[in-house]
Amino acid sequence: MALIDVAISCLNSIREIEEDVKDAIVYIDAGCTESFQFVGAFPLFLELGARAVCSLENMTSLDAVADWNSKSDCAKRIVIMTSRLLNDAHRYMLRCLSTHEGVQRCTVFTSISEGSHSAIPDSPLGPDAYREYETLLVQDYNEHTKKSDKISKDKGVSKFSSALESLTMEPIESENVDISSGGAQGLVVSVHHFPLIICPFTPRAFVLPSQGSVAEASLSRQHEDSLSFGLPPISTGSMSDTDDVPPGATLTAHFLYQLALKMELKLEIFSLGDQSKNVGKILTDMSSVYDVARRKRSAGLLLVDRTLDLITPCCHGDSLFDRIFSSLPRAERFSSQAQLKQGVPSINRPSLDVQVPLGELLNEEPSKIRDSGLPEGIEAFLRGWDSYTSAPQNVGLFNECDKKSTTNWTELLNGSLVATECFRGTPYLEAMIDRKTKDGSVLVKKWLQEALRRENISVNVRARPGYATKPELQAMIKALSQSQSSLLKNKGIIQLGAATAAALDESQSAKWDTFSSAEMMLNVSAGDTSQGLAAQISDLINKSAVAELQAKKNEKPDSSSRGLLSFRDALLLTIVGYILAGENFPTSGSGGPFSWQEEHFLKEAIVDAVLENPSAGNLKFLNGLTEELEGRLNRLKSEETKEIPSDDQLDIDALDDDPWGKWGDEEEEEVDNSKADESYDDMQLKLDLRDRVDSLFRFLHKLSSLRTRNLPLREGSLASESSFPGEPSGNKGLVYRLITKVLSKQEIPGLEYHSSTVGRFIKSGFGRFGLGQAKPSLADQSVILVFVIGGINGIEVLEAQEAVSESGRPDINLVIGGTTLLTPDDMFELLLGQFSHF
């Protein structure tokens, strides 16, 4: 039976819309851009006959000029692909149509189904969402066209923007709407569903676009069991009514349902965690007898709440893939236009579009770069491309000085990771993500060496067998990039090699290794005593505060400070420490895992660190206090400066014993009063700070109670086994432990099976005669899809494949997915950032 390949399925879905893409300008939003970059879809669009592939958010009228298929006539068709709800992408689509006034047909593809649009609260669209939106878009286009006719042409773009901002999307009243979508002076609008807008890292591992509506939607509402808008709530067993589930759960259920339809899978649904049960129930309710009959292949779907295992994505595991995504800069995300509905915000997750620094590798010889004429060519291109939207003074980026010129143009030469790039049929990313850091980097080095042999290129570089370093990777990449033919032929391994070299850079790898060592020490201390663990956390906070303060004094940290942790980093380790403490120590009388005295020392360490450097970390729990704390610190520094007399200052009072000169009793009294007021303000400020720190620790108590409050973890068989490092699964994440138990057919506490429609019918109809259907097992399925609601990281993908390999079941086709890709920094933002519930 053929293996499932989600990346190839995405490409096949694009081929299915060839008739719409042919001879059209294709606009894709930021979420689709993330997806299509991983899939490697841009060459396919041009192969199918697209005139150009352009950004929907950054569209200009010049997009019609960039015709890659050399069409002499004007474009009459536009295709818009979006990963957002139609109402969220509306203003971009309207601007696109209004700019290309000669367009006669607009085809919209959205990854959000009609059912999702009608299921979201406060949605302006109903069950017939696509048809309604076709009419609405034509109406708003007509309205804008009428307004534009009244605007003087010499006022240009600014007037267009103001007219566009006045257009809003209101619910459609059926009696006032002309159902025809083709009544706008020949403009025909059609809306279709395109479900496979996902970001596949490998053929069997994917996440959702971070700038799409599903990933941005909230996964919990604020209540006592919730931790963050971007994470499911704690699974206490009190499953909420599905009518009140957050929008993220609803959109996730609809996405998985449509994914199964597209992949022709009949799902047997299992869930672990309260939010997963909600999603499973929605999925089951959406199923019907006809859906089951249409699907060809049986598969098991295991839904898992991220909140059941927060420590894995918080830690810095041995994964080259995770190092790359944590080290490389990301593309700037576009601001979400999703409105705050019912007190639930959209989550601004970091873009998945990593910026591979290819330009930096070519920046070593500026003189050769200048002689090649490349900067002038890029400047000429930018002048022509940006002349419509950019001021003349902003276009000549390369004429200020040679150094700045070289820096600017190299920023344009950023690469990206593509999941479909292969080496002899093996996808680069798949082979790398299935290996740990050392093995993965050595594999990348071997691929580069093989590419050099194929191109007959020799490189004089000192290499250590069994190791890969940044200098040798850079030398090989630069040699492969000397000619255009070699660069294009080997672009996949060149980009991956550059990403690996950036992750192995000392400034990045030293800090990651420091994190990893600190987490290991916390793990060891958690297996000993609470006093030792508390002392370890306190030491990390104190050292990080001192290091950051020293770096601030030096303005620029020198090389000796590389690898040192910041105060923000220490807070992330504090989260890890509290979760470990909750798993290993019983709750003390203070409500947390530590005694009152142990926790008091931790609080004092954080208070002292904040008082010494209030701006460190840009922390949510200091909102509203940071400026006051900075003012206090600056005042104390200025007073210290005044108290130190200069060497040439003459002390008159020391030369004259006659105290009559000190006549300013009133002035001294005013100074004393002022100092008393300042002292009172300082005391009040410290009290406010301690209150904030107390609220932080109440949130840490909630994190430490995850094992006791999460119902599936109470029995202990799924909980972290960090205190037994000799066990094979001792330091593995929850996904590994789940898959291991599933494939060995062990009982999993809290795992719920959601009967299909046919199963419920058989159970209710024939069950009374003793002919009820037996509960299926996930292990009996040849295809298993594990989806983590809240997100996954690279180490979990690696461990999932390890679990399958160790099970001795090569017939199992395992696919792992998640809401988004999580890094430790992402977890910090979710737990202590603006979307946290503490």
Swiss-Prot record:
Membrane-topology annotation of the record: Peripheral membrane protein
Region span, Disordered: 637-677
Start-end of Acidic residues biased regions: 646-658
GO cellular component entries: endoplasmic reticulum membrane; vacuole
Record keywords: Endoplasmic reticulum, Membrane, Protein transport, Transport
Biological processes per GO annotation: protein maturation; protein transport; vacuolar protein processing; vesicle-mediated transport
Subcellular locations according to the entry: Endoplasmic reticulum membrane
Entry keyword Cell division: no
InterPro entries named among the record's database cross-references: Sec1-like, Sec1-like_dom2, Sec1-like_sf
Primary localization class, coarse: endoplasmic reticulum
Function in brief: Required for proper maturation of seed storage proteins. Forms a complex with MAG2, ZW10/MIP1 and MIP2 on the endoplasmic reticulum that may be responsible for efficient transport of seed storage proteins.
Similarity section: Belongs to the STXBP/unc-18/SEC1 family.
Protein known as: Sec1 family domain-containing protein MIP3
Protein species of origin: Arabidopsis thaliana
